[in-house]
Design a protein with these regions (language model features):
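Active-site glycine-rich loops that stabilize anionic/oxyanionic intermediates
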Residues: 35, 39, 45-51
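Short loop/turn motifs at secondary-structure junctions
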Residues: 38, 64, 102-104
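Catalytic nucleophile-loop/oxyanion-hole region of alpha/beta-hydrolase
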Residues: 73-107
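N-terminal cap/lid segment of alpha/beta-hydrolase-fold proteins
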Residues: 1-40
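Gly/Ala-rich beta-loop-alpha elbow adjacent to hydrolase catalytic centers
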Residues: 108-112
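Structural motif
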Residues: 40-41, 107
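Conserved alpha/beta-hydrolase
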Residues: 60-77
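Conserved HGGG/HGGXW glycine-rich cap/lid loop of the alpha/beta-hydrolase fold
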Residues: 41, 51-53, 58-62
Length: 112
């Protein structure tokens, strides 16, 4: 049995109506230790790559942290990429961690 679990997270971006790519939801995988709600979680995202199964997620969850491998609405649709909208999408992931997952501290993980 694994010491971590993965939950699918999918939410609409707040700026979806203002962008031609906006109909795609933000989505990702939230990794947590089994039987424990983390107080600290990390979020990692890439403008076009799929981070929902990020290689660091299981190791960090086993050590007691939450990890949200987050995909903006531009995953696989780089041609429509707008930085301002991607930042809003990242903010949606941070809000989900604080409001839905109950995390106290969110760490933005740079990875590129």
């Amino acid at each position: 049995m694994s010491a971590w679990k993965r939950e699918f997270v999918g939410i609409a971006s707040p700026t979806a109506p203002r962008n031609v790519i906006g109909f795609h939801p933000c989505q990702g995988g939230y990794f947590t230790p089994v039987g424990k709600r983390p107080r600290v979680a990390m979020i990692a995202a890439h403008y076009g790559a799929d981070f929902s199964e990020h290689y660091l997620a299981p190791s960090l969850a086993e050590r007691g942290y939450g990890f949200l491998g987050w995909n903006t609405r531009f995953r696989g649709a780089e041609v429509g990429f707008l930085l301002e909208h991607a930042l809003v999408d990242l903010g949606a992931g941070v809000s989900w961690l604080r409001e839905q997952a109950g995390v106290d501290t969110v760490v933005l993980l740079g990875n590129s």
